[in-house]
């Protein structure tokens, strides 16, 4: 049984930087419940990094991530950086290197949260959107 996990933390940009500390708190609480220790290694890879260095991550970025047990990635994107830069400079390389092809997004209406859909209540909206990244890209040829 693994009692210590090494996790790569990539907050990214904008909302990623805002929500990741809370996500870390949640994961730390869950880990303590199961007597796990989390060893966080933070990487400053973002669109702001791209603006400073010309790259979303260093050339040896995958080598830096490989020893980790998991990658916890926030959000990337910046008004002055084209979306394809963060996509092909960070997200796609990580997904491909570590065979991460499923993006699972739960959609659930919680009690006490206003809903713009008429007459919907908790339990009426409860499903998952599953995006599979399996098709080759034009950049693969």
Task: Please place each PLM-identified region on the residue numbering.
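Conserved small/polar residues in nucleotide/adenosyl-binding loops
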Residues: 133-140
């Amino acid at each position: 049984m693994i009692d210590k996990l090494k996790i790569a933390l990539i907050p990214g940009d904008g909302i990623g930087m805002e929500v990741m500390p809370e996500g870390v708190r949640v994961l730390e609480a869950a880990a303590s419940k199961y007597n796990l220790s989390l060893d966080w290694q933070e990487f400053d890879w973002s669109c702001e990094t791209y603006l400073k260095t010309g790259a979303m991550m260093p050339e040896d970025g995958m080598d830096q991530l490989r020893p980790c047990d998991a990658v916890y990635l926030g959000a990337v994107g910046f008004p002055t950086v084209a979306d394809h830069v963060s996509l092909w400079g960070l997200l796609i390389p990580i997904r491909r290197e570590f065979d991460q092809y499923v993006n699972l997004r739960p959609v659930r209406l919680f009690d006490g949260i206003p809903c713009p859909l008429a007459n919907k209540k908790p339990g009426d909206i409860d499903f998952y959107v599953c995006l599979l990244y399996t098709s080759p890209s034009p950049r693969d040829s």
